[in-house]
Regions:
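Short loop/helix-cap segments at secondary-structure boundaries that form the rim of catalytic
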Residues: 55-56, 74-76, 166-168, 229-230, ...
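Conserved acidic, metal-coordinating active-site core of Asp-based
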Residues: 108-220, 224
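Active-site phosphate-binding/coordination module
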Residues: 21-127
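Short hydrophobic/aromatic-enriched beta-strand-loop microsegments
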Residues: 62-68, 176-178, 236-241, 254-255
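Mg2+-dependent phosphoryl-transfer enzymes with acidic/Ser/Thr/Gly-rich catalytic loops
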Residues: 1-5, 23, 193-297
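Anion (oxyanion) recognition and catalysis
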Residues: 34-35, 99, 170, 231, ...
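Short active-site oxyanion
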Residues: 37-41, 62-63, 151-153, 215-216, ...
Length: 297
């Protein structure tokens, strides 16, 4: 088989957002891939603390993980093998902006998500979403970065406020990526990393460490923060539930996350199974847990 690794997004790609773990067909397919010598790479906007609970993956043990949208790549044990943390200036500017307008802001550190602004909003939202691995600690003392710098940030605000940020601080070149859908109170959610950073950079870092090329990789995702890796992988696929920008970046569309699209792709590419294609069924939005929330995540 020409491909050596499968890099899969987590939420609404490997498993439906809000469910406790990947569905059995996906778990079986990933384990079969690994038994045949393929490497499974979890690629996510989450930091390592958001994916380290083995139970949340239904028995899947990833070989590597591209975390924080490419800003930190780790091995199975969580050891960092490549990283691109935020600078002090980038972090302080985000804090100043979100404090001025009372927007929720968290930073993704090695050990946990720390909410530097509007902790209660973030914590309550995570509890409502009930997505395994997602929660934050109260970081409003704003001192965790004195130990080491975060790899990424996460903020909630109306979309027009992102433009206001860029008007004031565009010189920093921070990369904002919307994740999920707009919720009932008009807020959108954004993963934020250094300029030029995305999952494609993380995938390139990992391939270099493994002695592989990007042509050896298959990448699959569903939303804006996946576009970087979808564009650089040897073969790319977007879930049928994916966003228009993700669909525009890929070689092909596969089945919805709720019909085990990743499992079908593995069977096709590694085991000569039928071509993985969407069924055409309308499953509705895969982000219902966010869209129905108001005043919280």
């Amino acid at each position: 088989m020409q491909y050596k690794i499968l890099a899969s997004d987590y939420d609404n790609t490997l498993m439906p957002f809000g469910e406790a773990k990947p569905r059995p067909a996906v778990v079986k397919a990933v384990k079969k891939l690994q038994a045949a010598g393929g490497k499974f790479v979890l690629s996510t906007g989450r930091s390592y603390p958001g994916i380290r609970d083995k139970n949340q993956l239904g028995g899947i043990r990833y070989d590597y993980a591209i975390t924080c949208n490419g800003a930190c790549v780790v091995d199975r044990q969580g050891n960092v093998i490549a990283e691109h943390p935020l600078t002090s200036e980038e972090m302080y500017v985000l804090v100043d902006f979100c404090e001025d307008y009372n927007y929720p802001l968290q930073f993704n550190f090695r050990d946990a998500y720390y909410a530097y602004c509007e902790y209660e909003y973030l914590h309550t939202g995570y509890q409502m979403m009930n997505s395994p691995g997602l929660d934050c600690v109260d970081g409003e003392d704003q001192d965790r970065h004195l130990v080491d710098m975060p790899h990424a940030a996460f903020a909630a605000m109306p979309p027009q406020e992102v433009e206001r940020f860029h008007e004031k601080y565009g010189y920093l070149g921070l990369h904002w990526m919307q994740t999920g859908a707009q919720n009932a109170d008009g807020y959108c959610y954004y993963d934020i990393v250094r300029g030029g950073m995305d999952k494609g950079v993380g995938l390139a870092d990992l391939c270099a460490q493994m002695g592989l090329t990007l042509a050896d990789a298959v990448a699959v995702g569903d939303s804006a923060n996946d576009v970087g890796m979808l564009k650089v992988a040897g073969l790319s696929a977007c879930m049928a539930n994916g966003t228009p920008d993700a669909k525009a970046a890929v070689d092909r569309i596969i089945g919805d996350v709720r019909e085990d699209g990743v499992a079908a792709l593995i069977e096709e590419l590694w085991f000569d199974g039928p071509r993985a294609e969407p069924s055409g069924k309308d499953f509705g939005s895969a982000w219902g847990n966010i869209e129905s929330a108001g005043g919280s995540l």
